[in-house]
């Protein structure tokens, strides 16, 4: 629904969707990007920010932020590589261009991370260029290191204590994470 959408068009569309397709309709304000992109990008950007804060590697974060959290098994950074870092940057730019601090309290969280800018400048767009946060060379998987701007051997896993924590009932899991002293636990609490 936009300011220029005619009410009759919405009424006709809703009648068709409910009567002919048997679907329910959720009325929403017009907003840039698909809701999944907007929520997904916000989550990915929050994760990227905390990676910088805690100094974790992308392979460890993917291990923590994937299946163990009930998310896609590919985790945050592998998912970004599959989607395409240029596509991700485009979605971020659309949000930056169409939102403002006055219209969205989370506007400042849609800043493009340094690592994403660096990879784009290098021409590393993810899976489509065979290099992004990860790069496969033969049978070896490498991960990007922002400090050296080189690829290093990947495959490091999260500390098993966090895998066990994440299997606990919600209340116990949250208490354990809130009190975690290790960087990985503090990272999980932060995201």
Go through the PLM ranges and name each one.
Residues 1-191:
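N-terminal glycine-rich phosphate-binding loop for ADP-containing cofactors
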């Amino acid at each position: 629904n936009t300011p220029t959408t005619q009410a009759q068009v919405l009424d006709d569309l809703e009648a068709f969707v409910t009567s002919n397709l048997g679907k329910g309709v959720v009325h929403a304000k017009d907003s840039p990007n698909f809701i999944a992109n907007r929520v997904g990008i916000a989550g990915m950007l929050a994760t990227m920010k905390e990676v910088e804060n805690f100094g974790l590697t992308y392979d460890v974060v993917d291990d923590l932020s994937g299946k163990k959290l009930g998310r896609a098994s590919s985790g945050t950074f592998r998912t970004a590589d599959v989607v395409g870092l240029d596509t991700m940057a485009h979605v971020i730019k659309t949000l930056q261009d169409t939102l403002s601090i006055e219209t969205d309290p989370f506007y400042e969280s849609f800043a493009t991370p340094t690592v994403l800018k660096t990879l784009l400048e290098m021409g590393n767009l993810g899976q489509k260029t065979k290099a992004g946060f990860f790069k496969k060379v033969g049978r070896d998987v490498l991960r990007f290191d922002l400090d050296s701007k080189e690829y290093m051997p990947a495959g490091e896993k999260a500390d098993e204590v966090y895998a066990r924590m994440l299997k606990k009932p919600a209340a116990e899991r949250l208490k354990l994470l809130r009190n975690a002293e290790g960087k990985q636990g503090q990272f999980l609490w932060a995201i």
